[in-house]
Amino acid sequence: MSNTQPFFSQPLAERDAPVRSAILKELERQQSQVELIASENIVSRAVLEAQGSVLTNKYAEGYPGKRYYGGCEFADEVEALAIDRVKQIFNAGYANVQPHSGAQANGSVMLALAKPGDTVLGMSLDAGGHLTHGAKPALSGKWFNAVQYGVNRDTMLIDYDQVEALAHEHKPNLIIAGFSAYPRALDFARFRAIADSVGAKLMVDMAHIAGVIAAGRHANPVEHAHVVTSTTHKTLRGPRGGFVLTNDEDIAKKINSAVFPGLQGGPLMHVIAGKAVAFGEVLQADFKTYIDNVLANAQALGEVLKAGGVDLVTGGTDNHLLLVDLRPKGLKGAPVEQALERAGITCNKNGIPFDTEKPTVTSGIRLGTPAGTTRGFGVAEFREVGRLILEVFDALRANPEGDHATEQRVRREIFALCERFPIY
């Protein structure tokens, strides 16, 4: 036997016990806690298998049929499958599936369609936008003249009149529609009309709602935008990564050059394999049922929380996420996030529009139903989760240091619920 054989045969448990231990503990956490982080989901066994495949060994700089390395025949097959499937899902003419993340996808569009110093108009982080849409700490806020639009103080809805006024005042080269914490549908046609009125390109970042769009439960931005970006996880249930879509051949060429060699070197072929598998799953008939359940569960969770005395930003949701205003309960986001985690429920603290608290504290939390729906939760289960969340809220309100007895009791109920809907 070759002395290299153990390298190829020794399992992780023998090779690196500390890493194996951490992975097993994370598996146990995912199995035993309710995941309500709106940007997270649970992938299939098939996606895990593809992402853990030998494709991790392969360098494949370039694009299918035009690689800078030899031995890319089967890498080409996998990437072509991913491209064809995502084009079919969103009825797009061109797709790039190589971005390592949504941020890389957004960065590639800016590199392709704008120059440093150009004006970019995007949704402010405070109003529910994303860091990559022009926030000051991000590259997009440093390289570009980033102008930000927000929401109406009374309705908390996007103020399209403000978007239009800012566009005419600042004449942006690029307008970005998309969000990380906005619970309502977007009017892509209105965004495109505004962009056309000032000669700007329209980019839609559909990362959060890509699955909702794929299922036909939200307007398709590919029909309106010059270019569309997304992540592959969240509501699409794929591996962590990104992609870019367009129907414009010239823009597609610029995007390809911006992704490679502009921002990235070799693509992560094992992740692209996972993307291809996930896209194939989206094309199955039961994916629409899944998304319908995600939306119904979000409505059910929201109804319970509202009945329990908390406010929902905009009054409800059109998608998979809820932005919960904790001020009626006299609570803040950071301690609520911590208390819920102690009780077996994971979410994230989140600012609400016009929040006066620091981003590390916040007046709200963001909740989402995709992961719980993936493991099989229905309306009844999400109503139960909502009831348990309210119990933690009320206990924390009575005891700001945390109510250990209530949190542990809720944790036991959450554990029992999760045992009924196992993963992996």
Curated annotation (Swiss-Prot):
<dbReference type="GO" id="GO:0030170">
    <property type="term" value="F:pyridoxal phosphate binding"/>
</dbReference>
<dbReference type="InterPro" id="IPR015421">
    <property type="entry name" value="PyrdxlP-dep_Trfase_major"/>
</dbReference>
<dbReference type="GO" id="GO:0035999">
    <property type="term" value="P:tetrahydrofolate interconversion"/>
</dbReference>
<comment type="function">
    <text>Catalyzes the reversible interconversion of serine and glycine with tetrahydrofolate (THF) serving as the one-carbon carrier. This reaction serves as the major source of one-carbon groups required for the biosynthesis of purines, thymidylate, methionine, and other important biomolecules. Also exhibits THF-independent aldolase activity toward beta-hydroxyamino acids, producing glycine and aldehydes, via a retro-aldol mechanism.</text>
</comment>
<dbReference type="InterPro" id="IPR049943">
    <property type="entry name" value="Ser_HO-MeTrfase-like"/>
</dbReference>
<comment type="similarity">
    <text>Belongs to the SHMT family.</text>
</comment>
<feature type="binding site">
    <location>
        <position position="125"/>
    </location>
    <ligand>
        <name>(6S)-5,6,7,8-tetrahydrofolate</name>
    </ligand>
</feature>
<dbReference type="InterPro" id="IPR001085">
    <property type="entry name" value="Ser_HO-MeTrfase"/>
</dbReference>
<comment type="pathway">
    <text>Amino-acid biosynthesis; glycine biosynthesis; glycine from L-serine: step 1/1.</text>
</comment>
<comment type="pathway">
    <text>One-carbon metabolism; tetrahydrofolate interconversion.</text>
</comment>
<protein>
    <recommendedName>
        <fullName>Serine hydroxymethyltransferase 1</fullName>
        <ecNumber>2.1.2.1</ecNumber>
    </recommendedName>
</protein>
<dbReference type="GO" id="GO:0004372">
    <property type="term" value="F:glycine hydroxymethyltransferase activity"/>
</dbReference>
<dbReference type="InterPro" id="IPR039429">
    <property type="entry name" value="SHMT-like_dom"/>
</dbReference>
<dbReference type="InterPro" id="IPR015424">
    <property type="entry name" value="PyrdxlP-dep_Trfase"/>
</dbReference>
<keyword id="KW-0963">Cytoplasm</keyword>
<feature type="binding site">
    <location>
        <begin position="129"/>
        <end position="131"/>
    </location>
    <ligand>
        <name>(6S)-5,6,7,8-tetrahydrofolate</name>
    </ligand>
</feature>
<comment type="subunit">
    <text>Homodimer.</text>
</comment>
<dbReference type="InterPro" id="IPR015422">
    <property type="entry name" value="PyrdxlP-dep_Trfase_small"/>
</dbReference>
<feature type="site" description="Plays an important role in substrate specificity">
    <location>
        <position position="233"/>
    </location>
</feature>
<keyword id="KW-0808">Transferase</keyword>
<keyword id="KW-0663">Pyridoxal phosphate</keyword>
<feature type="modified residue" description="N6-(pyridoxal phosphate)lysine">
    <location>
        <position position="234"/>
    </location>
</feature>
<dbReference type="InterPro" id="IPR019798">
    <property type="entry name" value="Ser_HO-MeTrfase_PLP_BS"/>
</dbReference>
<dbReference type="GO" id="GO:0019264">
    <property type="term" value="P:glycine biosynthetic process from serine"/>
</dbReference>
<dbReference type="GO" id="GO:0005829">
    <property type="term" value="C:cytosol"/>
</dbReference>
<keyword id="KW-0028">Amino-acid biosynthesis</keyword>
<keyword id="KW-0554">One-carbon metabolism</keyword>
<dbReference type="Pfam" id="PF00464">
    <property type="entry name" value="SHMT"/>
</dbReference>
